[in-house]
Amino acid sequence: MRAVVQRVISSKVEVDGKVIGSIGKGLNVLLGISKEDTEEDIKYLKEKIINLRIFEDENEKLNKSLLDIGGDIIIVSQFTLYGDCRKGRRPSFIEALGGEEAYILYNKFVESIKKEVNNVATGEFGADMKVYIENDGPVTILLDSKKTF
């Protein structure tokens, strides 16, 4: 399971011109799910994301987590995080989990976050979305539950 985690001032997702999810200060998470992912990957990434100390304290040091600041989170599914561009010019998505299986793991991830964070918004799984991100910093962190980077 992979995530691109961005510290944001605000973020929103539109589908067919309608806002379906929006947040204020917090994290925008683009989430990719692989064929190898399990509930253990969900647990690892959830704990890592909600406890990442990427918000500034009173001394402007990155010492506070999403939980510490009571921030919001928006989670957007993005299978392209498993795009393999090592061969040729067209990404291969063979490692990305698709369809119903990915939808189930995505929802389990979202539900695990909802148990910890008050304001959780999402995109629409499988939809063509417009994602608006007002970065703060910018601070962008790449996470992989298999620890490949």
UniProtKB/Swiss-Prot annotation:
Name under which the protein is recorded: D-aminoacyl-tRNA deacylase
Family of this protein: Belongs to the DTD family.
A GO term, aspect molecular function: Ser(Gly)-tRNA(Ala) hydrolase activity
GO biological process: D-amino acid catabolic process
Pfam families tied to this protein: Tyr_Deacylase (PF02580)
Motif (Gly-cisPro motif, important for rejection of L-amino acids): 137-138
Superkingdom of the source species: Bacteria
Subunit structure comment from the entry: Homodimer.
Keyword Nucleotide-binding: no
Function: An aminoacyl-tRNA editing enzyme that deacylates mischarged D-aminoacyl-tRNAs. Also deacylates mischarged glycyl-tRNA(Ala), protecting cells against glycine mischarging by AlaRS. Acts via tRNA-based rather than protein-based catalysis; rejects L-amino acids rather than detecting D-amino acids in the active site. By recycling D-aminoacyl-tRNA to D-amino acids and free tRNA molecules, this enzyme counteracts the toxicity associated with the formation of D-aminoacyl-tRNA entities in vivo and helps enforce protein L-homochirality.
The EC number(s) this enzyme carries: 3.1.1.96
UniProt keyword annotations, A-Z: Cytoplasm, Hydrolase, RNA-binding, tRNA-binding
Domain notes: A Gly-cisPro motif from one monomer fits into the active site of the other monomer to allow specific chiral rejection of L-amino acids.
